[in-house]
Amino acid sequence: MGKKIVFTGGGTVGHVTLNLILIPKFIKDGWEVHYIGDKNGIEHEQINQSGLDITFHSIATGKLRRYFSWQNMLDVFKVGVGVLQSIAIIAKLRPQALFSKGGFVSVPPVVAARLLKVPVFVHESDLSMGLANKIAYKFATIMYTTFEQSKDLIKTKHIGAVTKVMDCKKSFENTDLTSIKEAFDPNLKTLLFIGGSAGAKVFNDFITQTPELEEKYNVINISGDSSLNRLKKNLYRVDYVTDLYQPLMNLADVVVTRGGSNTIFELVAMKKLHLIIPLGREASRGDQLENAAYFEEKGYALQLPESELNINTLEKQINLLISNSESYEKNMSQSSEIKSQDEFYQLLIDDMAKVTKG
């Protein structure tokens, strides 16, 4: 029987990125790779865009909430259906392991794998677990964590951050990049705004409503909204980038980002000056606020509350970052929190082998 592994995770790009780092390595080593997710979710879109040899299985999924809502009744039913669908899929595949990156879509496959005695490996990126991974922990064989967790969580293994930033930077030049450089003023600093798969609208609206921003800076806006796409003097707006991602990062003097740990650790790995504008508690469980406080305390970045975002506060924080750039870059270069992709892959393979033999 050939080696098989099932991946799951979705809802945001951050719940898919690590999977897409690991999957090519498994494929290269001869594994048959399957993915359980929602056909209407961003995970399906990302898998399709990857062009990798992955079999995608769609299941029903529902959002789990900490508060009362009548929608919970329907969503609990959907989760139950998702568990039954996942049991059928995993029982048929008989994989050696399941790897979960979290998000609500991951709960049914994790539960199903455990019921079928398939080893479950889970990854948690944030300082505090989301509800989906709190549930997943109960069914996990091992949970890998980016940050140190309570010693009471005996199944956790702290590994640090695994990012999509490679150890070497490839030189890259194409027509788009040349045009962008020609549109930019070499005498101005360049800001790159990136909001992730959630929360980009605040940045998009701020840039649209603050024309004076383009007088003070060259502005790159990875917006997630194709209707905003344009290139003009001192401004480049694009909905989504793949090959251009690293070159655009290289162009930026400062990156303005949300508070997701995946993106921030990429910036730390690149030693890129960054300003964090986290999602508040009214729009999230507060994990981005915790992340922002952590990275600021480490001396990697500055933060700015979304409610205080305007041209004056932004300019003040940007100036502080640039005037103290040596200190921030030194702190990032000395970080011991980044784990190489190959190191984590080998650790996962070794742990899977131990569990299988055990």
Curated annotation (Swiss-Prot):
Compartments it resides in: Cell membrane
Alphabetical UniProt keywords: Cell cycle, Cell division, Cell membrane, Cell shape, Cell wall biogenesis/degradation, Glycosyltransferase, Membrane, Peptidoglycan synthesis, Transferase
Topology term for the membrane: Peripheral membrane protein
GO molecular function annotations of the record: undecaprenyldiphospho-muramoylpentapeptide beta-N-acetylglucosaminyltransferase activity
Reaction catalysed by this enzyme: Mur2Ac(oyl-L-Ala-gamma-D-Glu-L-Lys-D-Ala-D-Ala)-di-trans,octa-cis-undecaprenyl diphosphate + UDP-N-acetyl-alpha-D-glucosamine = beta-D-GlcNAc-(1->4)-Mur2Ac(oyl-L-Ala-gamma-D-Glu-L-Lys-D-Ala-D-Ala)-di-trans,octa-cis-undecaprenyl diphosphate + UDP + H(+)
GO annotation terms (biological process): carbohydrate metabolic process; cell division; cell wall organization; lipid glycosylation; peptidoglycan biosynthetic process; regulation of cell shape
Record-stated family: Belongs to the glycosyltransferase 28 family. MurG subfamily.
InterPro entries in the record: GlcNAc_MurG, Glyco_trans_28_C, GlycoTrans_28_N
Source organism per UniProt: Streptococcus agalactiae serotype V (strain ATCC BAA-611 / 2603 V/R)
Pathway: Cell wall biogenesis; peptidoglycan biosynthesis
Gene name per UniProt: murG
Name of the protein this chain belongs to: UDP-N-acetylglucosamine--N-acetylmuramyl-(pentapeptide) pyrophosphoryl-undecaprenol N-acetylglucosamine transferase
